Amino acid sequence: MAAAALGFGFQAMRAPAVPADTIVAGFQKTTVASVADAMDQVVGRRGFMSHDMRPRTAGPGVPAKFAGRAVTALMRQATPEQASPTLSAKHSVEMIDNSKPGEVGVLSIENGLDVAGLGGLMGTAARARGMAGVIIDGGVRDVGEVRALGLAVFARSVVPSSSVGRYATVDRNVPVQCAGVEVRPGDIIVAGEDGVVAVPSDRAQEVLKRANEIDQRESKMVPLIQQLKALGKAVQQFNRI
């Protein structure tokens, strides 16, 4: 149920202070594209989610880019016994209610593009907990309310439908597939206008180092390209495109 349907107003909320995490802080300063390239080069596999994983609550007061450690929940088509609101969202509610400030919720809904995994009420809770953002392999609804809260949500679709009676969560804090990428609890999620990248926690330091190197290389290329009014020599000199 949308919060507005109950007659309550809503407003942007101030998130609690986030404990220091030097790895996360480093990824907050890198570009999403450089993190994607660093995953290719360091880990040797794709880290970026599918092209339709887009920011759905972008606007004033909503972070355009964020990074944080993943907490996860998995949702599948419901059985008749799972049709109640309590059971339908049990694990995603627990994911939010047990989250720490700065963490990123990752909700995987199997074949769930026409199902909203988060709306105004869950968004209110996520923002109150100080979550950095939420990533949904599926849909989101109540986008105006969630935007007004200041919560960044990336999802593959925007739909008005409830998950109740259709889908139910089956587990949380387990590895999930999210828009073509495996995400494990504690992995680093980096999200921005270019999309979303998941970085394995055990390779995060290496990936961050390479992403910083890529950013630094490109920052040197830009003035050279402007000076030469050409691209080829800069690409040859820096081996980067």
Q: Which ranges hold each PLM region?
A:
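Intrinsically disordered, low-complexity regions enriched in acidic/Ser/Thr/Pro/Gln residues
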Residues: 6-87, 92, 97, 217, ...
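Extracellular/luminal Protease-associated
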Residues: 95-137
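Ligand/cofactor pocket segment of small-molecule handling proteins
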Residues: 128, 132-160
